[in-house]
Regions:
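Glycine-rich phosphate/diphosphate-binding loops and the adjacent beta-loop-alpha structural elements
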Residues: 75-116
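Feature captures C-terminal
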Residues: 1-46, 50-54, 61-64, 100-102, ...
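Secretory-pathway-linked proteins and extracytosolic
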Residues: 71
Length: 273
């Protein structure tokens, strides 16, 4: 959408009126239509002030083509090799989101059914490592819906990573107590029960058992934290933890109500993408 602003000047640097019109730019290709239908479609478009049929600017397209080729080359650069399929699954089990994966075998894989998406878990662990490198982090959290595709076994490129994580999120560090961390997981599970499978949480340095049949506040059990020595210990609800997550759920989105209540003094945008 491109905005058009009409702001007449009074000749002295001011103005006494302001008007505008948003324009939705659309192409002129309308598909294959009979002549009368094509004429009717064009007339309808012309009658809509917000719609503007626009042809690509040849000079701008030529400039952009050079950069598009560079983006294509950058996207082809290898960054890793996946030794096996990294399956996509938002929610473990067979009752919700059981056919998310596009890779053969992933939807029936026993590990995926029991534990959820491999690729979501990998993203959560990557967030944790980035947080530990830049400012420190005890745990990480990623919503299952923020990860969009599987990764097939074989070379992984920059382009693959952008497809897995297509959103322009940044990593945010939050300070919260163990009790608030537990409440955050309960928030996410409540959102899942309400029908939002994308809220299902994946974490680095945290593990738990979940029973979605239980009421709110009782769905998370055996919640443990992997400490700096690599040992799994019970989460201390009175202790303070530094959690790295994406800015979307840090703001309380996707049902993460508790995170949205944290004050500015307890959050830091790292600006890491």
């Amino acid at each position: 959408v491109v905005g058009g602003l009409d702001l007449p000047s009074d000749g002295h640097g001011g103005g006494n009126s302001c008007a505008g019109q948003p324009h939705i730019l659309i192409g002129s290709t309308l598909g294959t239509l009979p002549a009368d239908a094509l004429a009717a479609a064009r007339a309808d478009l012309a009658s809509q002030p917000a719609l503007r049929v626009t042809e690509p600017d040849a000079a701008a397209s030529a400039v952009l083509a050079e950069y598009a080729e560079q983006v294509k080359d950058f996207g082809a650069e290898p960054v890793a090799v996946a030794q096996q399929n990294l399956c996509l699954r938002r929610v473990p089990g067979t009752k919700r989101d059981a056919s998310r994966s596009k890779l053969d075998g992933c939807n029936q894989d026993a590990h995926v059914i029991a534990h959820g998406g491999d690729v979501q878990q990998l993203v959560a662990e990557a967030f944790l490592r980035q947080g530990q490198r830049f400012g420190g982090a005890d745990v990480s959290l990623q919503n299952g819906g923020g990860v969009r595709v599987d990764l097939a076994a074989g070379p992984v490129t920059v382009g693959h990573i952008y497809t897995v994580l297509p959103f322009k999120n940044t990593l945010v560090a939050l300070s919260l107590t163990g009790a608030e961390l537990r409440a955050t997981l309960e928030d996410a599970m409540q959102s899942v029960v309400a029908g939002n499978t994308g809220s299902y949480p994946y974490a680095g340095a945290l593990r738990w058992q979940v029973d979605l049949r239980q009421p709110l506040g009782q769905r998370i059990g055996a919640l443990e934290h992997r400490n700096a020595q690599g040992q799994w210990v019970a989460l201390d609800e009175a202790a303070t933890y530094r959690m790295i997550t994406n800015d979307f759920i840090a703001a309380g989105q996707d049902g993460h109500t508790t995170l949205g209540t944290l004050g500015a003094d307890r959050r830091e945008d790292t600006f890491l993408a």
